[in-house]
Amino acid sequence: MSERGDDDRTTSTINSLAKRRYQDNLDTFQEERAGFQQKRPHAVDDEDEDFETAAPPTKQKTKAEEMMERMGYKAGEGLGKNKQGIQEPVALSTQRGKTGLGHEGAKAVARDMNEQWDDSTENKTVEETVIWMTDIDEGIRREICDKLIKDDQWMVVRKEKKVIDDETEFCSEKELKDMIEAKNVFDSMSDKDLREARTRANPYETIGSAFFQNRAAMKTANMDKIYDWILSRENTGNNSFLLKNPLQEGTTAENVDRHEDLFYFADVCAGPGGFSEYMLWRKAFYNAKGFGFTLAGKDDFKLQKFTASSAYFFETFYGTKKNGDVMDPENIDSLEKFISEGTDGQGVHLMMADGGFSVEGQENIQEILSKRLYLCQLLVSLCIVREGGNFFCKLFDIFTPFSVGLIYLMRVCYDSISLHKPHTSRPANSERYITCKGLRKEFAGVVKDYLKRVNRKLDELKNKNSKDDVMELMPLDVIKSDEQFMKEIIEHNEVLAHRQTVYLQKYKSFAKNQGQFDKDQGNLRDECLKYWQVPNKQRPRGGDRGSRNGNQERLNPNVVLGKYTSKICGEAELGISFRGLGAASDPQLLIGTGDAVFIYRHGHFEQIDRDYARIPENTILLVDCAEEVKTDGSKIRISSDPHMIRIADAAVLYGDNVSQLPYEARMKAAQKFALALKLTKKTIQIGWGFRAKDITPHQVCCAQTYSLKELDEFQSNLIELKQRGEVIVLFKEGDRQFKTQSLRLTRIIKQDWQMGWSKSQQVPYVHSPLHQKEGSILEDQWKKREIHSSFWDSVILTNKDKQKMTEMMQHGHNAVPSTIWSWKPCMRTEYGPYKIMNHPEAFDGKPTISAIKSQIAETDLSTLRSKYTPLTAL
């Protein structure tokens, strides 16, 4: 408070000084100007003071004044026979818009430069307190569900209603009447005048959209904070989550949630996607996967405007009808199935809904017009949210038994619910949000089925053009019998109705006097963003495309590679690695730059269409482009889908630099990255309208890894087939199959070190002839001593590395790089897939699975060793 008081005093002082300086300059100017009134200044001598100053010349009458005199006009009197004409000049018009002269509505908002708003009627705060409604008793939950299972008698159908001013069961008549009257005043104002008054009057207006694509994103940020982060499920204990999204510009972000499970959310009726852009930004990197469902067409998601995060972690769906209509029963069923498939049957952690449509000219009955939208959004949450998951949804007025009945049923389905209007929701509208915490599947399933039946009934009445409507979802007396709920819902409605009335009156005052503006807007913006833990910055115009350096990074793979690699090498050295894996060619370095995806082939980078390779910017991977194989008995068919992009190793995952982590940790992060990019449906739609088309992009998956101790498990996933006399070995990876071309054995420690097994400690250790002073280093010290082989050590073999490795091999220092065990058949020898799979010992000095397993068993027996050396089936 003292800082703000100091700021006010400083501002007042500056204003006072400015006024004084202005007056001094004006006086000086007038004094100097007096000497330039004549071309030749009058010479002043001592005698001039004795003469009287000549009177100014008489002003000549204008033609208009002469005409007025002839009509009998005299100064101070009016025209007319009885001098009844007006004497004062005609006043400036206070008329607004095109409303007729004298219209009562026009008079109510007529211009008045003396109009002043009383700030004391407002309560401007940064922090907000949300109120959770009293939880419903478990016994009542069961009673209601039992009633809904038996029949649909609670569903009341009668003649539709198009007025709201008599809905006083859940709000006092006075508050409702005052609010409606305040709304009616603006019917005579143009949209332009109303928007202009709102911009100056709303104390939180300048918060805007910050660096997101629209204001909806900031609503989510606002709600996330005041509900103690239950929406994004951020762990805010020690503020470590801020490392993912630093508040200070220029600070490097750190993925502290790399080891957390993937966060799933759904964004329903929320185009163009501000909710989702915030959630992907807040979770950061590849920690979240979103599903979107909204109307197709002009109100669709604007994925190209996702600049705070990558839209590749967001998958859209439009239902069976492909129109995104959430009120269509078939679309709801297909969305439920889609989300189940995309989340392995679990559902999303969070559903967000922001549905609405224009009710121009019918603002007072917005609740009645939106009742089915209310129903379907809340119904979808019961279909797709997982056990214990959360949900929030935009509502408007809730005065009717239908709306209040819906809210009551949400209390049955969730542990707790809350109704709240955040600061970022403009105060003069009836918008508010229902937030539901902790879904209870036991009860939600029953209510879901009931609401689906209600929606089908509404659909039936609509298709028949019936004048009837579903007016109640549960008896009014059942709701009223819950006295605590009635008290809370009435209090909520009256508080919001009063606040809305106050701000409608403020808009009216600011519309009258256009010189008024809310002086707290700038200060509130800064303090709110700080409180919500959102950086105070603006959205860049044109994104990075307005910057030459940004363009280089978005289009040049070498620029991205140079940001992260610790090795200096030429392009020719990138290909010196190892032979093919699941494909016929070498494994390839893939780099995502933002505007393009590049793969290193044949000694140079080749660009892939980014619509088909959905890889976000700042990504560096070692990949195997493999064809998926379909089988029909003994027949083998290559899938017609584009090649799979299989991750064999990872350096950078959407800006998360994992290159220095141990190989197993890198691959675990890559698995999460691939899961976030996974498409539930193989095809996606790009464009809309007549430009819309369906495409099948490359699927991204992570190659499965095994240690040599897991050869039995690996072998169980192999399928041996004969085709045209040739043995072909397929390996299963999830629900897919690939040809086994070779195995990649990855070195997990740096080239300088050799691994051993401590019999006394029963743990691995390393030692090195080149670092004898270091002695033996046990496994728990490897990370601290940087023993693990990095991505760059494994993938990029520079000429200097080759020379060092050759010298080590010459001195018998066991220089074994990451290598490939080829399984391809050879025309000159019988060695191939069949011998590798079935021969009981080494064949012609070459390894087989049985020979390796025997060697491992012997080593285990002598050292009691239990693990290590991962291999990848590729």
UniProtKB/Swiss-Prot annotation:
> EC annotation?
2.1.1.57
Query: Which sites bind S-adenosyl-L-methionine?
Result: G273, D354
Q: What is this protein called?
A: Cap-specific mRNA (nucleoside-2'-O-)-methyltransferase 1A
- How is this protein annotated for GO cellular component? cytoplasm; nucleus
The catalytic residues are: K394
What catalytic activity is recorded?
a 5'-end (N(7)-methyl 5'-triphosphoguanosine)-ribonucleoside in mRNA + S-adenosyl-L-methionine = a 5'-end (N(7)-methyl 5'-triphosphoguanosine)-(2'-O-methyl-ribonucleoside) in mRNA + S-adenosyl-L-homocysteine + H(+)
- Its biological function? S-adenosyl-L-methionine-dependent methyltransferase that mediates mRNA cap1 2'-O-ribose methylation to the 5'-cap structure of mRNAs. Methylates the ribose of the first nucleotide of a m(7)GpppG-capped mRNA to produce m(7)GpppNmp (cap1). Cap1 modification is linked to higher levels of translation.
Positions of the G-patch domain: 60-106
